[in-house]
């Protein structure tokens, strides 16, 4: 127990595999669940004072945590999940579930968020990665975000300052942490929005191995190609290392089929990159983030 942080939900030596979509990941020295911005600021100020590293994990959907875990503080925003509407502007805290947020927009007949109706993860992670699918992406509706700087200061960043690109935002370089974001939606028809979301979710269920733990899409789309197609053409569907294999359903996904480890994921990613490059001359670039220490 850290007496200076009394009252905050903090768990020591907590295995992160219980919180990641891949079901892999070693322990965090301290796993914290702040309930508000004040508790979040207390954690960051304390960690900085004690020279302890800290990071925000988000919903850990497009992420692999190594088997040795993470030193210092890991902060999860599960309890920072409020969503508010002000006219056609939707504001969501970073821990709000992305899929549930799209349902709130639909309930109020607001259009613009349909593309994200099947993307797992949090609002904060979606902004960080400029998440997208089926022709839409976060940058298309983003207005602004409140972020926490490494010093514990809270400031607002505009869409222009985010420098959005394909699976990229400026905060990937600055280290700022999204704590809430505002999005510009438009009035729409409930039935039309609902039908579009049902269509996209049906496509996702047909094409993606949602029944297995995974980190989502592993690789960025190479210019002029599709990663899954290149992997399939290199005869890598079903290729397995340890407990992790390239999905037979969608070669762009790697699934945990038998108590796989982060090392299994990393080894398989490296093997796929090498094999695809040898076969097609295209070098795939991972979209998934890999963090933490090896065993």
From Swiss-Prot:
Entry keyword set: Cell cycle, Cell division, Cell shape, Cell wall biogenesis/degradation, Cytoplasm, FAD, Flavoprotein, NADP, Oxidoreductase, Peptidoglycan synthesis
Pathway(s) the chain acts in: Cell wall biogenesis; peptidoglycan biosynthesis
Transmembrane annotation, as ranges: none
GO biological process annotation, one example: cell division
PROSITE patterns with a match to the protein in the record: FAD_PCMH
Cofactor requirement: FAD
Signal peptide start-end: none
Gene Ontology MF terms in the entry: FAD binding; UDP-N-acetylmuramate dehydrogenase activity
Reaction equations catalysed: UDP-N-acetyl-alpha-D-muramate + NADP(+) = UDP-N-acetyl-3-O-(1-carboxyvinyl)-alpha-D-glucosamine + NADPH + H(+)
EC number(s) recorded for this UniProt protein: 1.3.1.98
Organism domain of life: Bacteria
InterPro entries: FAD-bd_PCMH (IPR016166), FAD-bd_PCMH-like_sf (IPR036318), FAD-bd_PCMH_sub1 (IPR016167), FAD-bd_PCMH_sub2 (IPR016169), MurB (IPR003170), MurB_C (IPR011601), MurB_C_sf (IPR036635), Oxid_FAD_bind_N (IPR006094)
A GO cellular-component term linked to this record: cytosol
Active-site residue numbers: 167, 217 (proton donor), 287
Ranges of residues in domain FAD-binding PCMH-type: 23-188
Compartment(s): Cytoplasm
Gene3D superfamilies the UniProt entry points to: 3.30.465.10, UDP-N-acetylenolpyruvoylglucosamine reductase, C-terminal domain (3.90.78.10), Uridine Diphospho-n-acetylenolpyruvylglucosamine Reductase, domain 2 (3.30.43.10)
HAMAP family: MurB (MF_00037)
PANTHER family on file: UDP-N-ACETYLENOLPYRUVOYLGLUCOSAMINE REDUCTASE (PTHR21071:SF4)
Function field: Cell wall formation.
NCBIfam families, per the entry: murB, PRK13905.1
Family membership: Belongs to the MurB family.
Protein name per Swiss-Prot or TrEMBL: UDP-N-acetylenolpyruvoylglucosamine reductase
